[in-house]
């Protein structure tokens, strides 16, 4: 059973890195009728932002995989699995949008994935309450990060905006689930370290 679980997660990890993700929900579409044409500069900026979002979802897959594998609670395994499936939708949506913008995912995805997997293992080894607290804090920071992207996206890019808005709604739900399941608030130094690491990732992934 454990071996089967490892094989499943290994397959998911490879698909996350390779950009071949399964989509259980369709790509969110804007309410507006026809999207406006983006200028070259707007397309480039939107692509940079969506590449950052795609990297965030690669990291989310690794984090949830590690946390799922390190908990002994069947209920938490299911919670992490459910969140990972929704995050896999985000991964597919952002990859789809990058293709529409004639761009590509980050070249450093294997590095981002490996780093996030290691962090997830450490969080999981610290116990379920700490692991859930880490999940809740991660989702809070992602929510803030997506709020920033919603204000930065070109006004005409309603397609990217629709995707980011649905992603944000899902992240809020995941964070609440972690808190409701018993997640504790992380110490301030840990939260600051997470923000610093996130800043390095986002500033790099925008270009690479």
Curated annotation (Swiss-Prot):
Binds 2 iron ions per subunit. Its EC number is 1.14.99.60. It is an enzyme of class 1 (oxidoreductase). Keywords: Cell membrane, Iron, Membrane, Metal-binding, Monooxygenase, Oxidoreductase, Ubiquinone biosynthesis. Fe cation 1 binds at residues 57, 87, 90, 171. Catalyzes the hydroxylation of 2-nonaprenyl-3-methyl-6-methoxy-1,4-benzoquinol during ubiquinone biosynthesis. GO terms for molecular function: 3-demethoxyubiquinol 3-hydroxylase activity; metal ion binding. It comes from Burkholderia pseudomallei (strain K96243). Transmembrane segments: none annotated. Belongs to the COQ7 family. GO terms for biological process: ubiquinone biosynthetic process. GO terms for cellular component: plasma membrane. It is found in: Cell membrane. Its main location: membrane. Its cofactor is Fe cation. It holds the Pfam family COQ7. This is 3-demethoxyubiquinol 3-hydroxylase. It catalyses: a 5-methoxy-2-methyl-3-(all-trans-polyprenyl)benzene-1,4-diol + AH2 + O2 = a 3-demethylubiquinol + A + H2O. Pathway: Cofactor biosynthesis; ubiquinone biosynthesis. Fe cation 2 binds at residues 87, 139, 171, 174. It is a peripheral membrane protein.
């Amino acid at each position: 059973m454990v071996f089967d679980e490892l094989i499943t997660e290994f397959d998911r990890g490879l698909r996350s890195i390779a950009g071949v993700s399964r989509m259980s929900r369709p790509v969110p579409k804007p309410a507006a009728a026809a999207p406006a044409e983006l200028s070259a500069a707007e397309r480039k900026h939107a692509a940079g932002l969506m590449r950052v979002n795609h990297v965030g979802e690669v990291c989310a897959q690794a984090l949830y995989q590690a946390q799922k594998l390190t908990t002994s609670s069947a209920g938490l395994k299911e919670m992490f699995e459910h969140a990972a499936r929704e995050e896999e939708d985000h991964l597919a949506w952002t990859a789809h949008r990058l293709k529409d913008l004639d761009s590509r995912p980050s070249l450093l995805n294997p590095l981002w994935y490996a780093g996030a997997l290691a962090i997830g293992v450490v969080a999981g080894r610290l116990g379920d309450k700490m692991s859930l607290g880490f999940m809740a804090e991660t989702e809070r920071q992602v929510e803030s990060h997506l709020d920033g992207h919603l204000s930065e996206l070109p006004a005409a890019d309603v397609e990217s905006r629709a995707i980011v808005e649905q992603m944000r709604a899902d992240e809020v739900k995941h964070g609440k689930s972690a808190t409701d399941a018993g997640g504790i608030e992380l110490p301030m130094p840990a939260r600051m370290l997470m923000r610093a690491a996130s800043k390095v990732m986002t500033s790099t992934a925008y270009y690479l």
